[in-house]
Amino acid sequence: MEKKALKEIKCDLVVVGGGPAGMAAAVAAYEEGLRDILILERDDKLGGILRQCIHNGFGLHRFGEELTGPEYAARYEKMVMEYGIPFMTDTMVTGISPERVVTAQNTKEGIFKIKAGAVILAMGCRERPKGALNIAGHRPAGIYTAGTAQKFVNMKGYMPGREVVILGSGDIGLIMARRMTLEGAKVKAVLELMPYSGGLARNIEQCLNDFGIPLMLSHTVVEIHGKDRLEGVTIGKVDANRQPIPETFEYIPCDTLLLSCGLIPENELTKEYIQRSREWADGLHQPFLS
């Protein structure tokens, strides 16, 4: 059977990612006079991670008022709509060539190509999973990244568990400590490998101190217990080389472990196709990674 030619279109600017950064980039380009813009988003709606961030604290610098995550995203989505900037949701970008040919696919169009004058990458990050942390033990149910738990609670209406330990004190971990507490769970501790927290001081105060949740610095999870469902974790203090100190080990019974251990950039598209540079390429609107 003869192969069907891939559909190819042209566009002055393709924005990969329809989260707040992608929408802001598209809006800024439009306000600078560019009109031929296309946003590609793999999720079914624009907004990215902010759709599940129902806490406030967004928008103070950009809009001069305090907004929740969905409200902040909605502001940009409204501008995208008002400006008539086209976007495609449920669309996965699978490649970008050095000639700025973007390959994407969705259920409606199948596989198609876009010859772009310029490409903006706004794919965001993903959370570091348990497999990247080298924690001893089995793989029982009850272990989630903090963002996954946030989506379950805020968007799906599911509670991941009732007795919780959180590893990592980044802002999402601190916010989920408060969120789980408000939903009736008992957060027994937030552990942080470093001797300082990775979160904002206001989040430590509002999410931990206000609820009496202990923050244990220079501590980590050294072993996971349980086979079918998480039964508990062994924690311990770490030395200056971040190695666990055996005489400090302590067992904490819990049915849920949330991981807030950093983010991994969604940069796979850049590795093969895009030249890394700290300069603005050569004035020809070449895609770049700074």
Residue ranges, per PLM feature:
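Residues forming the flavin
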Residues: 1-290
